[in-house]
Amino acid sequence: ARVALESCPRVRRCLVVDGGDAVRAFGDPRCVDFEAALAAQPDTPIADEWLGTPMLYSSGTTGRPKGILRPLPENPPSEPLPLFHFLNKLWQCRDGMRYLSPAPLYHSAPQANVALAIRNGGTVVIMEHFDPEAYLALVERHRITHTQLVPTMFSRLLKLPEAVRRRYDLSSLEFVVHAAAPCPVPVKEQMIDWWGPIIHEYYGATEGLGFTACNSQEWLAHRGTVGRVLAGKLHVFDDAMKELPLGTPGTLWFETATPFEYFNDPEKTAEARSGDG
């Protein structure tokens, strides 16, 4: 808490779990024991009891990360967002699941998957940084059932000596998903040979405009696919923004009813839209 307050002078309140006497000894009025702060809150519902939502930032693939601002959902806190139900079914989440996150939580995908696991009453294990053998050891030690990786992590796992790869029991794995970058066909073939047909893939963006997904069987039948469209409507345009026929290479655009804008950046917001909005 001391480091957080000294590093971020504009922070107005720092809640400390199990703070107690240490918080009082610290003497900074911004530093408050969590239990004391909770006890001071009224137990009556507030007038406008709607669920909030985080403002996620893009990963910065095309430049600096951009804040993605959406209208607040009109959901009471007791009801999960529709996206939760969608991903919960797609990712085969369940009570007692054990999720391993090898990626940082400032990215939307790991953050969403961690939240899904917690909301299902599951256990979450978070790596401070990815190490391929340490990852395998964590899967075995915690009997991990669900995890998400990126293709680079697949490649690093496959580069481990065969003896190291066989050293760990990975039989608890039920659902492995990857995204974020194109996965070379030989890499994915080797991963399916190693872990079995439990590897899923999706294509999307932090903006949440559209979503495609496929399982191992679908991918093996159409190697290189990122699956069928499950959210949004997909269009393929040429450089002149003319829609192209099926099977023609071009730029992918998603048509969606989900509004968003880039925080404090109307120019980037306009660039992200086609001429008809």
Where are these regions (language model features)?
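Gly/Ser/Thr-rich phosphate-binding loop
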Residues: 36, 54-56, 119-120, 144-149, ...
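Conserved AMP-binding/adenylation subdomain of ANL enzymes
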Residues: 73-98, 102, 106-146, 160
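Conserved ATP/PPi-binding loop(s) of AMP-dependent carboxylate-activating enzymes
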Residues: 228-229, 242-273
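Conserved adenylation A10 loop of the ANL superfamily
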Residues: 55-70
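ANL superfamily adenylate-forming
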Residues: 4-55, 72-84, 160-161
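Adenylate-forming
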Residues: 66-70, 80-89, 99, 136-138, ...
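Short hydrophobic/charged patches on amphipathic alpha-helices used for structural packing
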Residues: 133-136, 165, 270
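Short beta-strand->loop structural element characteristic of the AMP-binding/adenylate-forming
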Residues: 2, 67-69, 123-129, 200
